[in-house]
From Swiss-Prot:
Official protein name in the record: Ribosome-binding factor A
Function: One of several proteins that assist in the late maturation steps of the functional core of the 30S ribosomal subunit. Associates with free 30S ribosomal subunits (but not with 30S subunits that are part of 70S ribosomes or polysomes). Required for efficient processing of 16S rRNA. May interact with the 5'-terminal helix region of 16S rRNA.
Organism of origin: Pelagibacter ubique (strain HTCC1062)
Main location class: cytoplasm
Keywords: Cytoplasm, Ribosome biogenesis
Lineage: Bacteria, Pseudomonadati, Pseudomonadota, Alphaproteobacteria, Candidatus Pelagibacterales
SUPFAM superfamilies: Ribosome-binding factor A, RbfA
Pfam family for this entry, one: RBFA
GO molecular function: ribosomal small subunit binding
Length: 122
């Protein structure tokens, strides 16, 4: 597995990314970040990718049912400081990474591939 530059992803990046993914999931499930006008208990964190220096975390999220995903991502980006503050209480690191949120398209991509396979099998 390699990141976009072509360098392999280290075990530390994977471990820290998974730790942040689990913590973000708990924060959203318990609504600990207190994001205004957003029900965070319906948000799923599918993956977190870390930068090489562990200072940037890109969290791929998907709201329940996939509806209003653009609005949810926008709200999360606006209130990322609240989420980061809640995350700082869960994770002890020298530098807590900046969190970037992105929509997870992997389920849509998998469904598209599955439909293509079904079409070729007919």
């Amino acid at each position: 597995m390699a990141d976009r530059i072509g360098k392999p992803v280290s075990q530390r990046q994977l471990r820290v990314g998974e730790m942040i993914r689990q913590s973000l999931g708990m924060i959203f499930a318990r609504n600990e970040a207190k994001v205004p006008n957003l029900e965070t208990n319906t948000i799923t964190v599918t993956e977190v990718k870390m930068s090489q220096d562990l200072k940037i975390a890109k969290a791929y999220v998907l709201p329940l049912g996939g509806k209003d995903s653009e609005l949810v991502i926008k709200k999360l980006k606006e209130c990322s400081f609240l989420i980061r503050k809640a995350l700082s209480k869960k994770i002890i690191m020298k530098y807590l990474p900046k969190i970037l949120f992105a929509k997870d398209d992997s389920f849509e991509y998998a469904e598209k591939i599955e439909n293509l396979i079904k079409q070729t099998n007919k």
